[in-house]
Amino acid sequence: MEFRLKELRKKRKISQLKLALDLNMNQNTISRYENMERQADYTTLIKFADYFDVSLDYLLGRTER
């Protein structure tokens, strides 16, 4: 499964630090999610989807929209 967090963040020119601060997370945690070293729980996935205004299916690489 493709996780589009890094793609979305880079497209919008947002640093890991800014994303972490905006979502009240640690930058290291964002890095681990992006590198698939850690899996985000459902609540965190919703935060990412809401932040980037995309569906969970898109965020998880299940759809192209």
Regions found by a protein language model. Give the residues of each.
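Alpha-helical residues within the helix-turn-helix
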Residues: 10, 21, 50
